[in-house]
């Protein structure tokens, strides 16, 4: 059994929304961590049907339970009308809920009761390196870190099914877009720009839609947890900076599949993009799991110098290179950044196995970086 890092107290006092993309392992995680809870699975069509027809059945079922009883409702967005009953049970009976879902969009879109701030959000991500005893970097770069894909003998088939199910159940059945074929084309174009600065106009031309529609498509990807934007760090008075965010799919395996990448080879541009994506993916999960208030951003000057990851208010700047030997030319972006933010801690993460300092810049092998990240932080 792989132990997940996502921290939810065994003695839970406050209710939570547990969000995570499909197949991140939410149900398995909750069943293992809270085996004695009352568990309601709304993916069971019979159970879903009964609660859909009569949401008050939940109150009747639970109103005689003791104060502090833990109730898990899996895939609450399937029957969001239950949230009124949940709110009532929390207020009147003192029950504690974990409300699980792979998309917050259904709740936002229809204006359902989100419990008035009485349940705080927690996110479960794909595997991170520290959760896997014999972490395989190449496996992660090729197929991503979703549990069924990383552990599978035939991940290609599973990745294909993943995208098909996403389009059918998250997009088509919820009528989130008018033209499913256009949206599918957008998914592929978005994969081509994975890790790049978003340009809605260029993507709109490639997809044959308006720039506003492209912006809405990106919102759908974020709300259904299939992707995320990384904002630009722009706090400076010294130079002109790029303002637009970058976009990443939530898991590198999904991006690879959309781009029809198979076995990635070190030294290629494709490998470099995937390598960077994996590090960004790991940093995002780390910040969330440690409940940090610091933001993940990137920095890019109009003159071309850039830094792939900035943590917090320029506390740490990280360049990510899939090279096997760090050379002075790889440090240009960090040096330019340091001239504007001299107090920043500077790191370059790479495949170079020799950890060392080059001036003020620390060179760290990727696996050592991951170990440090989860053991002592950065």
Regions found by a protein language model. Give the residues of each.
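Pre-Walker A adenine-sensing motif
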Residues: 1-11
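Conserved lysine of the Walker
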Residues: 26-27
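Short glycine-rich substrate-engagement loop in P-loop NTPases that contacts/grips substrate
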Residues: 40-70
